[in-house]
């Protein structure tokens, strides 16, 4: 079960990830996306960790990268807490401590989908990127 859904109360996948964090030593884990710019937070060894969650709908070998908008990356790096980017693929997931693992590339990306507004300009946005081949992929258990 891949842990991601934007619903306020969470879904089975969110509960799985919270359970996984608690099983691995985190305490007081809760959803925070209603009132913070990150999705989950919890304590480990007395320190607060914030989790930004991303969902990729294909296997990790198909995507080959982990992306985060440059604006969000800059914001999260300035937080006084530990910050982890959790990216979920259909086959595995990856956790990146964004304060201690610099992105491998900063690039611009244009969304491939046209919005419902036909006159909407497709504006490129800056993203930071880590390559999957250089990361440790974790199995769902």
What residue ranges belong to the model's regions?
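Conserved catalytic cores of phosphodiester-cleaving nucleases, focusing on short active-site segments
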Residues: 21, 40-59
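Surface-exposed cleft-lining segments at the edges of enzyme active sites
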Residues: 3-4, 57-62
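Non-catalytic C-terminal interaction segments of nucleic acid-processing enzymes
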Residues: 23, 43-45, 88-141
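Short, charged, amphipathic alpha-helix that recurs within catalytic cores of restriction-modification
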Residues: 61-88
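Acidic-basic catalytic patches of nuclease active cores, encompassing PD-(D/E)XK
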Residues: 1-32
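Short acidic/glycine-enriched loop/turn segments that link adjacent beta-strands
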Residues: 34-38, 91-92
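Short glycine/proline-enriched coil/turn segments at helix->beta-strand junctions
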Residues: 25-26, 45-47, 78-82
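A structural signal for short, well-ordered beta-strand segments and their strand-loop junctions
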Residues: 30-31, 50, 84-87
């Amino acid at each position: 079960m891949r842990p991601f859904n934007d619903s306020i109360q969470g879904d089975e996948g969110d509960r799985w990830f919270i359970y996984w964090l608690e099983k691995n030593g985190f305490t007081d884990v809760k959803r925070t996306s209603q009132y913070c710019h990150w999705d989950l937070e919890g304590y480990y060894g007395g320190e607060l960790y914030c989790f930004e969650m991303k969902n990729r709908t294909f296997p990790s070998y198909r995507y080959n990268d982990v992306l985060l908008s440059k604006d969000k990356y800059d914001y999260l790096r300035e937080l006084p807490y530990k910050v982890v980017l959790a990216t979920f693929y259909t086959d595995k997931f990856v956790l990146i401590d964004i304060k201690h693992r610099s992105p491998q590339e900063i690039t611009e990306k244009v969304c491939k989908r046209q919005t419902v507004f036909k006159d909407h300009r497709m504006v490129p946005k800056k993203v930071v990127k880590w390559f999957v081949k250089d990361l440790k992929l974790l199995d769902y258990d």
